[in-house]
Swiss-Prot record:
Known partners and oligomeric status: Heterotetramer of 2 NUBP1 and 2 NUBP2 chains.
Main location: cytoplasm
Entry note: cofactor: Binds 4 [4Fe-4S] clusters per heterotetramer. Contains two stable clusters in the N-termini of NUBP1 and two labile, bridging clusters between subunits of the NUBP1-NUBP2 heterotetramer.
Name of the protein in its database record: Cytosolic Fe-S cluster assembly factor NUBP2 homolog
Annotated keywords: 4Fe-4S, ATP-binding, Cytoplasm, Iron, Iron-sulfur, Metal-binding, Nucleotide-binding
Length: 270
């Protein structure tokens, strides 16, 4: 049987999904900062936002006032800089206004996602990070079904230390098992608070729930990312935090997580 890989993904080396069981856990923040960190390591990176009803990636990457252009092979992603090593695609670029709401039924959403996966000309890139909506819905099933022939490297599951968020991650793990998507690991976001004055990290919430869940479910634990007010400010400005806050515990955590992801994906390649 002939295996057909979507045209836009034929030169993509590694595909990683970013999932969360519920909203508000910082999934898009993790997706953007992982993309920046991979970029800063010298990789060519694509960031695809398929959260159709809440497209926050364009603003977080400081590219929201750009337009998507067409080429002979499809859509050209919006690049963050002239080196064209970090490209972004989101429905946010296709809306007339930032205030426009996407009020679509499932079939239209699914068709849009299929078009994103097949018609975006990513070119020869090392990583494609796919930021998904929270939960498990039609959008997730559409993504997984259309990526089957690409054999994605796996999914990163984002949670916070609270019990409610952690219990929702269990459903994400079950979803990955049912759809045969490997789990690259769990990231515990908002784990501790970094003082903006002394950079000391204090556990204002509970801590360690993500790591305990990873052990229980026998999936890798990638690390904890603390709350850092400076990181929040940089995200609001659409900046790569790792260039500006090299001594931040949050930067150290993200870089450590990226190292683990790079190691896992390189093993998949071999």
């Amino acid at each position: 049987m002939c295996v057909v890989v979507p045209q836009g993904l034929r030169s993509v080396k590694h595909i990683i999904l970013v999932l969360s069981g519920k909203g508000g856990v910082g999934k898009s923040t993790v997706a953007t900062q992982l993309s920046w960190a991979l970029y800063n390591q010298g990789n060519k990176v694509g960031l695809l936002d398929i959260d159709l009803c809440g497209p926050s990636i364009p603003r977080m990457m400081n590219v929201e006032n750009n337009d998507v252009h067409q080429c002979s092979d499809g859509w050209v992603p919006v690049y963050t800089g002239p080196d064209q090593r970090l490209g972004v695609m989101s429905i946010g670029f296709l809306l007339h206004s930032k205030e426009d709401a996407v009020v679509w039924r499932g079939p239209k959403k699914n068709a849009m996602i299929k078009q994103f996966l097949s018609d975006v000309c990513w070119g020869d890139i090392d990583y494609l990070i796919i930021d998904t909506p929270p939960g498990t819905s039609d959008e997730h099933i559409t993504v997984v079904e259309n990526l089957k022939t690409c054999h994605p490297d796996g999914a990163i599951l984002v949670t916070t230390p609270q019990g409610v968020a952690i219990s929702d991650v269990r459903r994400e793990i079950t979803f990955c098992k049912k759809t045969k998507i490997p789990v690259l690991g769990i990231v515990e976001n908002m784990s501790g608070f970094v003082c903006p004055h002394c950079s000391e990290c204090t556990n204002v919430f509970s801590k360690g729930g993500g790591e305990a869940l990873a052990k229980e479910c026998e999936v890798p634990f990638l690390g904890c990312i603390p709350l850092d007010p400076n990181l929040t400010m940089n995200i609001e400005d659409g900046k790569s935090f790792s260039d500006l806050l090299s001594n931040s515990p949050a930067v150290e955590s993200v870089n450590s997580i990226v190292t683990k992801i790079s190691h896992a994906t390189s093993q998949n390649q071999t």
